[in-house]
Amino acid sequence: MGLQLGAIVSALGGELHGDPALSIERLAPLQNAQPDALSFLSHPKYQQELAASKAACVIVAPAMREAAASRGAFIVAADPYLYFARLTQLWKAHHARPEADRIHPSAVIHPEAVVDATARIGALCVVERGARIGAGTVLKSRVTISEDCVVGERCLLHPGVVIGADGFGLAPHEGAWVKIEQLGAVRIGNDVEIGANTCIDRGALDDTVIEDGVKLDNLIQIGHNVRVGKHTAMAGCVGVAGSATIGAHCTFGGGAIVLGHLTVADGVHVSAATVVTRSIRKAGQYTGMFPIDDNANWEKNAATLKQLHSLRERLKALEKAPQKK
């Protein structure tokens, strides 16, 4: 069940050059697109792929208008990648299958939980006492929302997400550990997406807070009492330790780590595999990974790095020494 180009432009805008009645049967990347597909060009460096592509139509920026015109139908959009993102939403809605039961029969929902009439609860989900699920929110299979935790409106939680497990709180005593009961909850804002098997721990006393528009990838760990600001995005395997505060509009590459009790300002972008060991007070891009190398060179560089302080002191001493004439 395809979509005509005219219908796409009518719904999303853009400047169409080509037959509005042309039907698109699939969306595909430039290099793999067939004559019934629509694709997009997000960066001029892929212009060679544009010329070679078999796609029926391509979304391009204004600067690529001439290159696109030489190969067939195209749609001009100020931001082709954003246009394509909205197109995927239109495409999914157009091809949506009939909805099954709003609440799957295998889901377990406590009588004292509050689930909005428009929310959807998937197979084997658990919603515990006092939890609240907002309008239009979707819980995929095997999601757990623990006691008193709140999920806002229009959220999407993928399979295996756990909201409100106990935070990691322990007090040492005579060589053993005494559990600190986690008495807070988790509060998730509106329009939040949480990837598969991500865990967000409940607070020890205050709540763990995920603000509106946050996007979390798969396999992320958010510790107790963390606060994540609006529209921050984190890629897979990020870990945020307890009581860290993350600002708004930040991004974290895959495998990045934030140590506990630190503050990260708004607009900070942390590269993949970076370990944040101190608070970041100023917006910008931050990277803290050790460059990859063949093992022999890596070991030599690592050994040198261990001596960096002593080498610095020797250099300072040499700089202070009287110069021979």
UniProtKB/Swiss-Prot annotation:
PROSITE patterns: HEXAPEP_TRANSFERASES. Its EC number is 2.3.1.191. Keywords: Acyltransferase, Lipid A biosynthesis, Lipid biosynthesis, Lipid metabolism, Repeat, Transferase. GO terms for cellular component: membrane. It is an enzyme of class 2 (transferase). Pfam families: Hexapep, LpxD. It catalyses: a UDP-3-O-[(3R)-3-hydroxyacyl]-alpha-D-glucosamine + a (3R)-hydroxyacyl-[ACP] = a UDP-2-N,3-O-bis[(3R)-3-hydroxyacyl]-alpha-D-glucosamine + holo-[ACP] + H(+). The active site is at H224. This is UDP-3-O-acylglucosamine N-acyltransferase. The lineage of its organism: Bacteria, Pseudomonadati, Pseudomonadota, Betaproteobacteria, Burkholderiales. The gene is lpxD.
